[in-house]
């Protein structure tokens, strides 16, 4: 593993001196060409040629053939095919992968390129490795060592240098357009770069027969989350067709025949095959009764399999490991966890659409249990804080090994996913929905108590690190995370959704303190913060195209190559690096205030995501306002598909450069169960404001 470059050169010289019938530089040039190639298919072709070189002895020929076969599989097999050889072994076994190439072989530096990538993506993908400082450091250091050997042997290999921290610019920066607001120019370029990355995946990875992208169904199904600004915000036929192809294929697999996974797994993995396919299907095909009925069916599983009455007479999940037919019996898995709401996202959307009373009563009975547990101070949990888990069957707010905030003991499988605050805004969104559907104030109690604790923390920042599990610790972790596009922490996202839907000013003080990346404000300071966040995001998106595309080996981590370059091993905020803010783009263009896994979009712009920018500034149930800028030189025809306005009559108005412009038809009629479409013409290169409000 630690063969020096000098030893490799000595071995190369030995091969060259033994060459018969070829010029001495022929073998050398082939090895150099293979090592310096930045395209793996090109490398495969060169190795195929090298393998037929008549001067190679049997040993070197076998090594070349073995390496060529590995590279072929890298190009043509599943993205993590190499895991099969290390399955059942310690995580570090990936570092000893047998390429069939000796340590002193001149081909060894090429193997180091693949060893480094396997180590890097294992670190990026594996949460148990990533959150263990000792293991994370070993993986990072070993990967870097491999890439350094590659860079030393093959200085033209830009892929290895990218992993070592060299930023590789890609694409072009659009020319400035006079009159375009800064936010619009920044957003436009990011939308177009995101679309280019998505189209790369469709063109180069999507399989014609199944729609898969090579990372396995369980990882591929999560890709739509970072597609959301383009996929859900606009209308790109190629991208929409690709998503529909994948999701329709995914939900017809045998293990989902009954409507949910037939094999028991933890909820994050058991639910993703339904949630991460049904939700985009329900959004993209809203008139399909098939998907709505399937969403309603989640309520049947909840009633018949997943939940029961605990010893307090309350409804709760009996475990966070379950399938379509049973829950896990193990005591260490007998917890109702925050993330269990992930299995119910399709049901929540179906309830919101249909108002089904039976399903609503069931969901509310479960949420009542969480409201009650939040109010209690129990097992060290502060009153007013949602617990990480509720133990079955006694209904206590409790976790593993006496820690209320840890349903999984440290070092256990998926520990970092389930530890508090986990995906807390997914359950606070469910509480918000329950309030808007029923009008009951009780569902706001957890939001109010945690908002007060978060506000108290911001006003009185502790001088020392808070004790885990304490109120101060909770107040700190309720912060939205700048660099992690997830629902971990970030209570503010739910509060922003609630404000948008109801117009309440109750949480304004807290919302104002959390920053415009998460709460879009239209005042001067808010716009400056928003533009600063967009600049950071664009800086990350302008470099390292391979890190978003060809280098990715875990399709649920397409936006996370930068994680490998972080300066420490915590990865909470990716110290020293910035991740593209794809959720910010989604919030800007759709008017939603949170992540798309439980989408609450105000609008879809029925036009391609090119030469355009959109900023929704108001998106309540009765009013809508958006700023738009079209960068093209000719007027643009499009429609706004309005998704959040409650039934009624509305009037639309358009202003261009502050002056009213007459619409061909300014009437908007919203009927129950249907989305209205407003067609209009967007003028070229002028700031336009679209406003929709109730008819007097």
Segments and roles (model prediction):
Residues 1-6:
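N-terminal secretory signal peptides that target proteins for export/translocation
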Residues 651-653:
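Beta-strand signatures of extracellular beta-sandwich domains
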Residues 10-19:
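Bacterial N-terminal signal peptides
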Residues 667-696:
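C-terminal beta-strand-rich structural cap/linker in extracellular carbohydrate-active enzymes
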Residues 659-666:
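Surface-exposed loop/edge segments in extracytoplasmic proteins
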Residues 631-648:
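Surface-exposed beta-strand/loop patches in extracellular or lumenal glycoproteins
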Residues 26-633:
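Catalytic domains of carbohydrate-active enzymes that cleave complex glycans
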Residues 21-23:
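Boundary at the C-terminal end of the N-terminal hydrophobic targeting segment
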């Amino acid at each position: 593993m630690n063969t020096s470059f000098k030893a490799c050169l000595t071995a190369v010289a030995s091969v060259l001196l033994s060459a018969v019938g070829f010029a001495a530089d022929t073998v050398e040039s082939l090895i150099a060409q293979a090592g310096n190639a930045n395209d793996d298919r090109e490398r495969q072709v060169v190795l195929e040629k090298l393998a037929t070189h008549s001067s190679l002895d049997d040993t070197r020929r076998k090594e070349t053939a073995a390496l060529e076969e590995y590279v072929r599989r890298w190009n043509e097999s599943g993205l993590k095919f190499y895991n099969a050889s290390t399955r059942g072994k310690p995580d570090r076994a990936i570092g000893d992968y047998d390429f069939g190439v000796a340590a002193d072989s001149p081909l060894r530096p090429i193997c180091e390129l693949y060893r480094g990538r396997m180590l890097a993506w294992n670190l990026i993908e594996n949460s148990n490795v990533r959150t263990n400082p000792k293991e994370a450091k070993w993986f990072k250091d070993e990967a870097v060592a491999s890439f350094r050997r590659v860079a030393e042997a093959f200085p033209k290999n830009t892929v290895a240098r990218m992993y070592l921290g060299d930023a590789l610019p890609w694409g072009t920066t659009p020319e400035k357009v006079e009159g375009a607001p800064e936010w619009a120019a920044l957003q436009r370029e990011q939308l177009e770069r995101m679309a280019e990355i998505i189209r790369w995946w469709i063109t180069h990875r999507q399989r014609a027969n199944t729609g898969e992208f090579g990372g396995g169904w369980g990882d591929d199904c999560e890709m739509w989350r970072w597609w959301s600004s383009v996929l859900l915000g606009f209308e790109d036929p190629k991208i929409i067709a690709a998503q529909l192809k994948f999701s329709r294929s995914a939900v017809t697999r045998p293990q989902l025949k009954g409507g949910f996974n037939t094999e028991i797994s933890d909820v994050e993995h058991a639910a993703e095959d339904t949630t991460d396919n049904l939700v985009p299907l329900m959004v993209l095909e809203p008139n399909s009764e098939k998907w709505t009925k399937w969403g309603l069916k989640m309520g049947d599983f909840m009633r018949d399999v997943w939940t029961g009455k605990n010893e307090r007479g309350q409804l709760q999940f009996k475990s966070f490991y379950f399938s379509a037919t049973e829950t896990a019996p193990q005591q260490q898995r007998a917890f109702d966890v925050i993330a269990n709401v992930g299995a119910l996202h399709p049901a929540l959307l179906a309830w919101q659409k249909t108002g089904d009373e039976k399903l609503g009563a069931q969901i509310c009975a479960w949420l009542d249990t969480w409201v009650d547990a939040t109010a209690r101070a129990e097992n060290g949990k502060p009153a007013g804080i949602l617990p990480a888990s509720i133990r079955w069957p006694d209904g206590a707010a409790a976790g593993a090994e006496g820690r209320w905030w840890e349903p999984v003991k440290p070092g256990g499988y998926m520990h970092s996913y389930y530890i508090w605050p986990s995906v807390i805004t997914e359950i606070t969104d469910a509480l918000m929905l329950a309030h808007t559907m029923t009008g009951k104030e009780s569902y706001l109690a957890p939001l109010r108590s945690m908002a007060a604790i978060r506000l108290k923390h911001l006003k009185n920042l502790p001088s020392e690190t808070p004790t885990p599990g304490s109120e101060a610790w909770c107040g700190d972790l309720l912060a939205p995370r700048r660099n992690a596009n997830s629902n971990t922490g970030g209570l503010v996202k739910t509060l922003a959704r609630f404000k948008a839907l109801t117009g309440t000013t109750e949480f304004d003080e807290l919302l104002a303190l959390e920053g415009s990346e998460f709460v879009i404000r239209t005042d001067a300071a808010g716009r400056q913060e928003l533009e600063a966040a967009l600049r950071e995001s664009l800086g990350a998106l302008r470099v390292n195209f391979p890190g978003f595309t060809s280098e990715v080996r875990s399709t649920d981590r397409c936006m996370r190559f930068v994680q490998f370059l972080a300066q420490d091993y915590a990865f909470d905020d990716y110290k020293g690096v910035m991740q593209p803010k794809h959720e910010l783009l989604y919030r800007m263009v759709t008017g939603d205030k949170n992540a798309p896994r439980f989408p609450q979009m105000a609008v879809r712009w029925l036009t391609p995501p090119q030469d355009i920018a959109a900023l929704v500034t108001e998106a309540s149930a009765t009013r809508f306002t958006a700023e738009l800028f079209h960068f093209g030189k000719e007027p643009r025809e499009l429609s706004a598909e309005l998704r959040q306005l409650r039934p009624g009559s509305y009037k639309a108005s358009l202003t261009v450069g502050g002056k009213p412009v007459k619409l061909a038809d300014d009437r908007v009629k919203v009927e129950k169960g249907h989305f209205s479409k407003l067609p209009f013409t967007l003028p070229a290169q002028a700031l336009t404001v679209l406003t929709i409000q109730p008819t007097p």
